[in-house]
Amino acid sequence: MKSHDLKKALCQWTAMLALVVSGAVWAANGVDFSQSPEVSGTQEGAIRMPKEQDRMPLNYVNQPPMIPHSVEGYQVTTNTNRCLQCHGVESYRTTGAPRISPTHFMDSDGKVGAEVAPRRYFCLQCHVPQADTAPIVGNTFTPSKGYGK
């Protein structure tokens, strides 16, 4: 009887391992990680992306600045933030990128820390890249007085 239980457990573990491996292969299928500086081994801070357009004007008070370049392939995870390689306090002078705002170092209680606050770490929650494309739906938005083009 013990031999039967051992075989059953071994079959279950083999099936689980096959499921995990096939899931990982399926998840990574078609993803090109070679352009990511974290994977390609490019020296941190050495990448200088060419600007695709000038900084765009703001349309309302406290609008987060828009991103004037592509962010395709950028990794922003809990362990790494590709945006900070150019916009971080340590690197913005050498890259020519705008420095991250001091407000990004404040926590939810208003205390200023030495590192980017967790609630401000994921840049693409507020800052969005722009593309010169036709809108999907009509837009009648007009900038606040004194803002916009």
Swiss-Prot record:
<dbReference type="GO" id="GO:0009325">
    <property type="term" value="C:nitrate reductase complex"/>
</dbReference>
<keyword id="KW-0813">Transport</keyword>
<comment type="function">
    <text>Electron transfer subunit of the periplasmic nitrate reductase complex NapAB. Receives electrons from the membrane-anchored tetraheme c-type NapC protein and transfers these to NapA subunit, thus allowing electron flow between membrane and periplasm. Essential for periplasmic nitrate reduction with nitrate as the terminal electron acceptor.</text>
</comment>
<comment type="subunit">
    <text>Component of the periplasmic nitrate reductase NapAB complex composed of NapA and NapB. The interaction between NapA and NapB is weak.</text>
</comment>
<feature type="binding site" description="axial binding residue">
    <location>
        <position position="69"/>
    </location>
    <ligand>
        <name>heme c 1</name>
    </ligand>
</feature>
<keyword id="KW-0249">Electron transport</keyword>
<feature type="binding site" description="covalent">
    <location>
        <position position="126"/>
    </location>
    <ligand>
        <name>heme c 2</name>
    </ligand>
</feature>
<keyword id="KW-0408">Iron</keyword>
<keyword id="KW-0574">Periplasm</keyword>
<comment type="similarity">
    <text>Belongs to the NapB family.</text>
</comment>
<dbReference type="InterPro" id="IPR036280">
    <property type="entry name" value="Multihaem_cyt_sf"/>
</dbReference>
<feature type="binding site" description="covalent">
    <location>
        <position position="123"/>
    </location>
    <ligand>
        <name>heme c 2</name>
    </ligand>
</feature>
<feature type="binding site" description="covalent">
    <location>
        <position position="83"/>
    </location>
    <ligand>
        <name>heme c 1</name>
    </ligand>
</feature>
<feature type="binding site" description="covalent">
    <location>
        <position position="86"/>
    </location>
    <ligand>
        <name>heme c 1</name>
    </ligand>
</feature>
<protein>
    <recommendedName>
        <fullName>Periplasmic nitrate reductase, electron transfer subunit</fullName>
    </recommendedName>
</protein>
<keyword id="KW-0732">Signal</keyword>
<keyword id="KW-0479">Metal-binding</keyword>
<dbReference type="GO" id="GO:0042128">
    <property type="term" value="P:nitrate assimilation"/>
</dbReference>
<feature type="binding site" description="axial binding residue">
    <location>
        <position position="127"/>
    </location>
    <ligand>
        <name>heme c 2</name>
    </ligand>
</feature>
<feature type="binding site" description="axial binding residue">
    <location>
        <position position="87"/>
    </location>
    <ligand>
        <name>heme c 1</name>
    </ligand>
</feature>
<dbReference type="GO" id="GO:0009061">
    <property type="term" value="P:anaerobic respiration"/>
</dbReference>
<dbReference type="GO" id="GO:0042597">
    <property type="term" value="C:periplasmic space"/>
</dbReference>
<feature type="signal peptide">
    <location>
        <begin position="1"/>
        <end position="27"/>
    </location>
</feature>
<dbReference type="InterPro" id="IPR005591">
    <property type="entry name" value="NapB"/>
</dbReference>
<dbReference type="GO" id="GO:0046872">
    <property type="term" value="F:metal ion binding"/>
</dbReference>
<dbReference type="Pfam" id="PF03892">
    <property type="entry name" value="NapB"/>
</dbReference>
<keyword id="KW-0349">Heme</keyword>
<feature type="binding site" description="axial binding residue">
    <location>
        <position position="104"/>
    </location>
    <ligand>
        <name>heme c 2</name>
    </ligand>
</feature>
